[in-house]
Structure formats: C-alpha cells, structure tokens
Swiss-Prot record:
Gene Ontology CC annotations of this record: chloroplast; ribonucleoprotein complex; ribosome
Major location (coarse): plastid
UniProt keyword annotation of Ribosomal protein present: yes
GO molecular function: structural constituent of ribosome
Single Gene Ontology BP annotation: translation
Name used for this protein in its record: Small ribosomal subunit protein uS15c
Name of the gene encoding the protein in the UniProt record: rps15
Assembly information from the UniProt record: Part of the 30S ribosomal subunit.
Family note: Belongs to the universal ribosomal protein uS15 family.
Cited Gene3D superfamilies: S15/NS1, RNA-binding (1.10.287.10)
Length: 86
C-alpha cells in the first residue's frame, strides 16, 4: 500500500519537495480512510482526515500554478482526480 517515491521523483528531491509531500499525504489519507471504514464513529480521526485532504489540495493548487507538467505526471501516477477549476 505504500507509495514508491523513487518512481515519482528523483533522489535529490525526496526530502521536502512538494511532490514528496503530496505522496506522503496521499498515503496517510489512504490509511485513515481504511481506519474510518472500520471505525465510522471516530470523529477526531475524521477531522484529521479532512485537515490532511485540505493540505494536499492546497499543495496541488500550488503545483498547478508553478509546474503544471509535474502536476499532470503526479496525479496520473497517484491515481488522483484533477482539481476542479472555476
């Protein structure tokens, strides 16, 4: 279930790049989603999940504005939907 960062980003960029942060947040979202399927009344975990989703969304918005090609590549590799644009 863990996401292999070497498939997505280079060795130099693994530490704190936007791409690696999005990958780690996606992994945490998947883990919390599985947890909430078992424990549907765990409201504090649900609140934490919403917080992580908002953080990932803001990083994805930042990535679309600064490096759209990298954004396209990342969402295709992670299996995410495109952001809604107004």
């Amino acid at each position: 279930m863990a996401i292999d960062l070497s498939l997505i980003i280079n060795e130099k960029e693994k530490k704190g790049s936007i791409e690696s942060q999005i990958c780690h947040l996606t992994e945490r979202i998947k883990r919390l989603t599985l947890h909430l399927k078992k424990h549907s009344k765990d409201y504090s975990s649900r609140k934490g999940l919403y917080k992580i989703v908002r953080r990932r969304k803001s990083l994805l918005v930042y990535l679309t504005k600064n490096n759209f090609v990298c954004y396209e590549k990342l969402i295709s590799q992670l299996g995410l939907r495109r952001l809604k644009t107004h």
